[in-house]
């Protein structure tokens, strides 16, 4: 019997190793000295999609979902790049959209010098991984406890039933399925100093799912929900 249970535990270990890893929690870094309560508005840059595989329509959906959830969850005024350019253009009397097309270095310098006038913090984000994988659980043997009954008659002709349990092997064939593999990085900066105040890296893998956008949205919601908690 000991040898049977030893085989069972070895097979069980093989099954767990075959499953895709699920991150238990995001990895955060927070500046403990920063006063998040003084934040009144935030600049949300488009998420960087450079290192992830996606179509043009997927990219548009990713950006739209990202900004929509950030604005909804933060519950404080948030601005995107279009509004940022407009606000700074009005403040300095020059058209930032035109400058960005003709001189990227000057545009970057003007934004850096004037960002603090329109936002308290700004957030840069990056989509690192956006894929669908396949997990495989090898064929293995499970063990099931079954109850068996024996009936007999005693010397007086009375029928009795006794039960006893035993463990029996159950063969489980190989199984496979999809899982989403989505990883994002977030970095929030103080607009006045450029100092990093809150970063997060989160990998989420969801078994039996091929809905990458749903997994992506969960990560985005988690970050901005937690940022809101710090601000409140």
Locate the predicted segments by residue.
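C-terminal/domain-edge helix-coil "capping" segments
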Residues: 23-43, 132-232
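Bacterial N-terminal signal peptides
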Residues: 8-20
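N-terminal segment of the mature soluble domain
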Residues: 41-131, 195, 199
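Short alpha-helical segments and helix-capping/turn motifs at coil-helix boundaries
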Residues: 1-2, 17, 106-110
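Bacterial N-terminal signal peptides that target proteins for export
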Residues: 1-9
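Intrinsically disordered, low-complexity segments enriched in Ser/Pro/Gly/Ala and basic residues
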Residues: 2, 22-24, 101
């Amino acid at each position: 019997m000991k040898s049977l249970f030893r085989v069972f535990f070895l097979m069980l270990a093989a099954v767990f190793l075959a499953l895709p890893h699920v991150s238990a929690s995001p990895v955060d870094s927070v500046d403990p000295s920063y006063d998040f309560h003084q934040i009144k508005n935030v600049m949300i840059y488009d998420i960087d999609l450079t290192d992830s595989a996606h179509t043009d329509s997927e990219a548009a959906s990713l950006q739209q979902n990202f900004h929509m959830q950030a604005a909804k969850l933060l519950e404080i005024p948030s601005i995107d790049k279009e509004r940022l350019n407009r606000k700074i253009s009005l403040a300095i009397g020059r058209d930032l959209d035109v400058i960005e097309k003709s001189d990227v270095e000057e545009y970057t310098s003007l934004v850096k010098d004037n960002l603090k006038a329109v936002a308290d913090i700004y957030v840069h984000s990056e989509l690192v991984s956006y894929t669908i994988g396949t997990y495989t659980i090898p064929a293995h043997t499970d063990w099931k406890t079954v109850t068996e009954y024996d009936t007999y008659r005693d010397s007086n002709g009375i029928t009795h039933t006794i039960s006893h349990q035993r463990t029996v092997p159950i063969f489980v064939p190989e199984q496979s399925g999809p899982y989403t593999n989505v990883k994002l990085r977030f970095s929030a900066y103080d607009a006045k100093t450029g100092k990093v105040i809150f970063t997060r890296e989160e990998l989420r893998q969801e078994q039996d799912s091929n809905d990458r956008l749903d997994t992506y949205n969960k990560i985005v919601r988690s970050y901005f929900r937690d940022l809101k908690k710090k601000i409140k």
